[in-house]
């Protein structure tokens, strides 16, 4: 159910190239949370700017005001406006939106995040109460974010960087292969990040027969299916929109060659 609320920014801090905000969201989480991996739609500015879809890093049911944490990078006029807001300011927020990851609290998952695709995976880590493993990828060690939270909320955390300045030197799919060779008993691989990363992770998961779900949230534009930027082709010939039909899809259904 779509809820619109005026949300107060109660905390704001810089995380590498990203900005983290904690919002007081009224009853939004209690009324509309379905699964980790959903997003919110934030009005950015008072003019003709579209609302911007922002993935939810974590959410908490609290009376009287639920708490939402969002982590985002400045990628245009809308997110630049959002980055200029301060603690105490109020945002017009719609949420929680989209279809998140299909998962059980009792499950054990291999969580894979790349770059700004890392924050949505924190909600998955919290949802399973420390039973899951996280593999996090960044361009370099100084770009790493949220690693301490994952270490507190996961059974194990593995890190990869493109330049080798932190953790494994290389891409996350190599660590996914390494982990599944050691233990292929995960209920599923859940991933969020750039499309090439998702494709490679899905391929490795398929080789080990482990189900894989991918969040294609990086491709969202307007968040309401109007701009068509987030069209995603399926193997059955269907064309779906990440913001309306996703952002999470079964990796086996995605046409990775489209």
What is the predicted role of each segment?
Residues 77-216:
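FNR/FR-type flavoprotein reductase catalytic core
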Residues 45-46, 96, 235:
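Short, surface-exposed secondary-structure boundary micro-motifs
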Residues 2-87:
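Ferredoxin-reductase
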Residues 244-258:
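Short microdomains enriched in Cys/His and/or Lys/Arg
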Residues 11, 58, 159-161, 214, ...:
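Structural signal for conserved beta-strand scaffold positions within catalytic alpha/beta enzyme cores
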Residues 120, 195, 217-248:
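Local cysteine-cluster metal-coordination motifs and their immediate loop/turn environment
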């Amino acid at each position: 159910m779509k809820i619109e609320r005026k949300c107060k920014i109660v905390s704001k801090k810089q995380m590498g190239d990203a900005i983290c905000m904690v919002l007081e969201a009224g009853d939004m989480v209690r009324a509309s949370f379905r699964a980790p991996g959903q997003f919110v739609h934030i009005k950015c500015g008072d003019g003709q700017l579209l609302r911007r879809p922002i993935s939810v890093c974590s959410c908490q049911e609290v009376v009287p005001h639920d708490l939402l944490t969002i982590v985002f990078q400045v990628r245009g006029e809308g997110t630049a406006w959002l980055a200029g807001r301060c603690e105490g300011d109020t945002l017009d927020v719609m949420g929680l939106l989209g279809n998140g990851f299909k998962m059980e609290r009792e499950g054990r998952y291999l969580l894979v995040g790349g770059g700004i695709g890392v924050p949505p995976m924190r909600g998955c880590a919290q949802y399973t109460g420390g039973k899951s493993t996280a593999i996090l990828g960044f361009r370099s060690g100084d770009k790493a974010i949220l690693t301490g939270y994952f270490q507190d909320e996961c059974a194990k955390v593995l890190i990869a960087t493109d330049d080798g300045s932190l953790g494994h030197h290389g891409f996350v799919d190599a660590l996914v292969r390494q982990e599944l060779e050691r233990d292929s008993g995960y209920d599923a691989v859940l991933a969020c990040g750039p499309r090439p990363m998702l494709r490679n992770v899905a391929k490795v998961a398929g080789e080990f027969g482990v189900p894989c779900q991918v969040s294609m949230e990086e491709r969202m534009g307007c968040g309401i299916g109007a701009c068509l930027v987030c069209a995603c082709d399926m193997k059955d010939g269907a064309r779906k929109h990440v913001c309306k039909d996703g952002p999470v899809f079964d990796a086996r259904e995605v046409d990775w060659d489209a």
